[in-house]
Amino acid sequence: MDERIPCKNPQCSHFILPATAARTEGYCMPCVQARYRQVQEEYIRKNRKTIDAFSGITNPVEMLKLVHEPREHDPLIEWIPCPIPTDELYKKLSDDESRDMVDYAEELFDSGWQEEAQEIALCLAAFTQANLDNFLRQVINEEELELSSPLPFHRAPPDVRDALLQKVETDDENRDGILCALAWIGDEVVVEHFNRWRQEPPAWSASLHILPHRYAHQAGWELTENGRRRDLYFTQCTHLVKQAPEQPAVFRAVAEYGENCPHCSLPLINLFEVAPSAVGLSTQGWPGQIRILTCQCCTAYNTVFATVDPQGQPRWYEKNALSTLAVENSADWITLPLDVLHPGESRLPLFAAEIFLPTTFSQLGGHPAWVQDTDYPTCPTCAQTMMFLAQLSYEDIEEEEYAEGMLYGFICPSCQTTATSYQQT
């Protein structure tokens, strides 16, 4: 066997065969690959072009078309991002401009760019009041019903609803997505069908991971005992931003509580302090201010509940589950900064209802943006599903590049019980 010789790179400790050295000018393969990458990166650095496709364009429709334009990755091109956030562009659209974007989505869908078309439809459904009836008809008439998101169906016309009710009986492959779309429609006819399926589960329900009527949670509602719709979120919705308002509001996000967690010893916080009227709740529905008590470490592992005493003060729920992981990690836990987010502009209730929407997610009221699965907690007092109150995105409050995840706050107006949970990718 030939004796191995050292790599020509003085910083490298590898040895190679003479035959390899003859082919690589004396370098080992890792060093050859590193030199190739270095040459390639230098070529890209010298030849890369910066392109501003938005230069001189002020029309929001034209800007949005560029935002949604599919582009293949090219290391020699650096695209300057749109100077206006995507959600702000959609908010600027007039009624006519919204119709132009709907027409554009329909054209893309017909041309085979279905993913891009559904992306636009999702934004229109969340950020505007655009009429998507014809687009939804296009989607359900496809042989292969592929839904990027069922949210756009929340304003679907009766004929689309009826077509989906027919499809759900026979389309085994797409039944899950169809039920989600029906849940988002959520009108009286859908509620009636969901209630009927609850009373007499259809044969095809055996193939589902949850019962058909449980899909209502995907769209923020559920059936009551008497078969009516009960919403699980407040339609009055306010964006939470770092900029403090000119007029101080009766609101705080992440406020000191004054006691330590009985499980992990980290200081407890009120995740939210909210006036009931901020979400349209009457004082009879919740006397005094809503204070959602939690431990920001423990709630990362388990749902944390709290009760309200006769004086309106939150108290730790004694039966909260103990997390050994929280106890182990609390000493190194990076706590949230206090009182950073404040009420901003009002927004539509579904503005941040889908985690893939191009927006910021911290908000009071509205529909939650689930990072993982839909997970409304059950009130430990009355066993009723709790209502979503507010959410805080770590990306909106933390400066660290890798900050992620969402904290959710819930209330049971009947019992004055609160809960918090956490989800991340």
Curated annotation (Swiss-Prot):
Domain of life: Bacteria
InterPro entries: DUF1963, YwqG-like_sf
SUPFAM superfamilies membership: Hypothetical protein YwqG
Pfam name, any one: DUF1963
This protein's name: Uncharacterized protein YpfL
Organism: Salmonella typhimurium (strain LT2 / SGSC1412 / ATCC 700720)
Gene that produces this protein: ypfL
